Amino acid sequence: MIRQNFNADWTVEKGDGNSRMNSFLGNTQTKTVHLPYDAMIHEARTPDTKNGAQTGFYPGGEYIFQKHFTAPQAWQGKLVSLVFEGVYQTALVYLNGWLLTRNVNGYAEFTVEAGPYLKYGADNLLKVIADNSLEPNSRWYTGSGIYRPVRLLVGNKVYLPQDTVRITTREVGQGFALLDVTAQVQSASTVTERVTLQQTICREGTAVLTDRQNLLLQPGESRTVSFRYCVDSPALWSPEDPNLYTSTMQVLEGEEELDREETRFGIRTLSIDAAHGVRINGQTVKLRGACIHHDNGILGAATLPDAEERRIRQLKEAGFNAIRSSHHPAGRALLDACDRYGVLVMDELSDVWNVRKNPYDYALYFEQDWKPTIQKMVAKDYNHPSVILYCVGNEISEAGSESGAETNRRLCNTFRELDPTRYTTNALNGLMAAGYRLREIMGDVMRKFPAQPGPSGGDGGGSNALNSFMSLMSGEKGDYFATHPLLTEALSGCEDSCDVIGLNYLTGRHVLEHELHPHKAVLGTETYPADIVRLWRIVEENPHMIGDFTWAGYDYLGEAGCGIFHYDGGANFSSIYPERTAYIGDLDLLGNRRPISYLREIVYGLRKAPYLAVLRMERNGQTSSKTPWMFKDNLSSWTWPDFEGQTASVDVYSASEEVELFLNGASLGRRAMVDFTATYSVPYTPGELKAVGYTGGLCDGEFTLRTAQDAQMTLTADRKTLQANGEDAAFVMIQFVDANGTADLHTKHTLKVELEGAGILEAVGSANPCSEERYDTPESETFDGCCMAVIRAGEAAGEIHLTVTADDSVQKQLTILIQEAEC
């Protein structure tokens, strides 16, 4: 079977439901693009968009993608299919005027059969209408268009259907592993066919084993063929050592190869139970988890493989060993990256079932679409060793009802039938699941915790109903709410049918659930970042607690303002333009680690050295808004020009017993650590601020901040060589650093980026959560001293020359080599 990338030479134009008339009148503007392509990121944001803050004020729309191609005569009589990994929201696929399919799930992969509609030896027109015009339809930034890759499949008379080679680790013993391999072989022939199915398993290019079976296939027959192997001295896959193998399954007719399917997989066992937690190859692993959305920051939703790999690599380097695909099936490139870096995956079905959260969301189609979506999801995930959990839903509104419990049971059972090797969960939110019980629960909470009047005699400074609900999910109120008997009643139906009990913002139940369900593992499927000390203590002290997933690991577009610090009286969740990002990730929109990330790494036990963070001095004396998702508005910087003599609030994060802080060599005293933190008030003086940790009286780590002196612009690319495939990408960080390597995070600079040569300037932007700058223009202002340019390779070899001009004066240049693409 031919399996090839089908991403090149597309055109896109904006539609409005009347594309034929617009084309006739010449009212369209077409652009040639290389997929994946997100059309939403190129739209102008407006305060009055129907999506509001949910998408960061980006509007949706209808987009018409077209591609002309020639179908060789040799394809005639063969199975010709097109695989679309993701088109948002609704996709209508036409070939030469024929409607091939309508797909309603913007996150689900789908396949169309093209053969009967092709013109062989002639020009063909493939048209995809990506309709994201029914708004609002999502609680976060979705992107629009064909934002994931497209593949072409051309099958011979006998072939291996996509995703039908399955490799299962049955047992791992001392020096061996038992594997079961199954393959579905399909005959499209009108006569009996005699073929050989040959299996080869390789590790790092060296064959480990080879086997074959001879088959006699009747016309049109589909057969499942099984192999069983014992692999000697296997290199096992684990988060710490993610060894991968390659399976090559060939269909041979004599010496002719009719088809070939290559599958990367890992040899590992998986078990989850209340006594031992998650075990990979018999070893217990606590899940250090990050919830992530699918966008790639300033790229929007375009799923470039290099962007997905970069994101997973950065999360792993920050101490995470697991991600949750929130709230939809993960893309293939993301799963591939997780396999390579040893990051475990909770793959998720949907944010809604049959009750809407937005007027035009997936709830409109869920009942008729969930089963094929699960089938495709499992087929996609099965051979990925990183995938360990299927999450059937997120904060489902009907979870506390009888009908919701029954839906949960059907979903979990379907996952188990299709994949008995993995486990199911549901990310349950108490506020959503409580349903009709919520009024009574809230009454009990308010009687237990009477409202405290604010300074003006009001309700705490004018907090609205949303803030009142949010307060139920944190602190003592949150624990009382979480453990309320009526909430236990509401959650019981879904909890009974899941393998793992998943809880969103219900920390008070993490221990209680073991009393109620002693044989079930429990997981914090979504939790507040600032609660990591308490959360991780519960995880470490309780075998049934298998891990914690923070919201969120990486900042993202949409849900704008959830974590933005308002010092002007503004309130979070108030849909304030031009807010664009949630601003609550451990890593910011560009992938820079924020102070909460280092605290988390210390709490995890992965970092011995202390870490220093300073509250933004320009906000001294000011009071900000606050939500449970927010940590502190601080930076790891000792460069605060114009604030000499003013008091800086300095946090030291450390796992040591005590720390000592030094300013320009003078001790500011030792302090015992409380919840991994010690806070100092320090008069700001430029120079050196150093923290030293002590345990048992001995130094066990130190960390130093220095004031930046005469910082100069630097350009740092994560890659200097790209393939000329139209999809490779380099991420260029633009910072201002002095001769000692100290970055100036304070001074703002206006940047202009220019590119010449064999590539495309795909995006330019900063991590500023509240900016009107576009990401598809070459200009940007730094935020916290940083900006980023994303360079995408073209389809011809050559060089890319990048020039960045700062403040209309200083220039820096960078060259990236574009090599011929590998076949």
Tell me what each language-model feature is:
Residues 4-5, 11-20, 152, 390, ...:
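Substrate-binding clefts and catalytic carboxylate motifs of secreted carbohydrate-active enzymes
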Residues 176-216, 225, 648-666, 688-693, ...:
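Beta-strand-rich binding/interaction modules
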Residues 2-19, 36-39, 54-161, 204, ...:
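Accessory beta-strand-rich segments of carbohydrate-active enzymes
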Residues 193-198, 239-246, 647-649, 655-657, ...:
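Short flexible loop/turn segments that cap and initiate beta-strands
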Residues 114, 227-236, 679-684, 778-795:
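Short, hydrophobic beta-strand segments
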